[in-house]
């Protein structure tokens, strides 16, 4: 007889370690899993470091069978989301679980109960978000072909997660679509023709790459365009200055300036395109650690990246 499922709140450094470490065991042997850096996961969860928690709260849970951790989940309340959307929606995130419907139901139930405490009057639980709508969002559902390893900042999970969520009473609320396009000389030429046509028809617009020597001001322009362009999109929550600053510190050494572009009308930014090398192609070989040898694998592998992640 299998031991029963128990769910408990993460309340000690040992529990937190179990929470962080679970995916590395669950996905062992999965050639498409990209292990996130453990330091990044801890940073995301840390209310003292991640500025998202300045306007949000969370409770973390572990599911066990005996001494074995079989699942995890976070209940999250984001005051900024509820201010913008004028609702009482809470979230779940960081969900990982063995193919164990009983454990999954217990985790979702714990998150629902915690959400009512974190957000009195809560009437909806949505997820996964890890930890916000500006981070990894949703379950991976399908791809036109074999999905392969995820691109930087994209979600990844086993197909059975959809069944676990459905068995616990969840249903799909929204499809979020990511597109993959091959790039070759013909596509570059076509993009060049489109850009030239836009310039001819709109001579008041200027196109330029990012000025890394004026990074703080450039970052403020990203914030203005991003929050303005996305404000009517489903589920959007504007990034605070603190969140944008934190993201910039993480990305500054990763972005490739020739593929970060601004479009301006006079002195006003009206569009941007942020291109980043898909460093997941390197992270997949690092085992979730920078030390002792992860940093060397990163330095040796970063120049071999042949895919770009675009945000615009």
Task: Identify the residue ranges that each predicted region occupies.
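Residue-level detector of conserved, well-ordered beta-strand and adjacent loop positions
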Residues: 8-11, 64, 93, 208-211, ...
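Generic start-of-chain signal for non-secretory N-termini
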Residues: 1-32
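Acyl-donor binding region in acyl/amide transferases
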Residues: 83-169, 286-312
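Catalytic cores of nucleotide-enabled group-transfer and carboxylate-activating enzymes in metabolic
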Residues: 13-16, 21, 35-39, 43-47, ...
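Acyltransferase donor/substrate-recognition loop-hinge adjacent to the catalytic core
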Residues: 3-5, 155-235, 259
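A conserved beta-strand-loop-helix scaffold within acyl/acetyltransferase catalytic domains
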Residues: 23-65, 75-83, 217-311
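Flexible glycine/acidic-rich beta-alpha junction loops that bind and position SAM and/or redox cofactors
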Residues: 131-140, 175, 181-182, 278-284
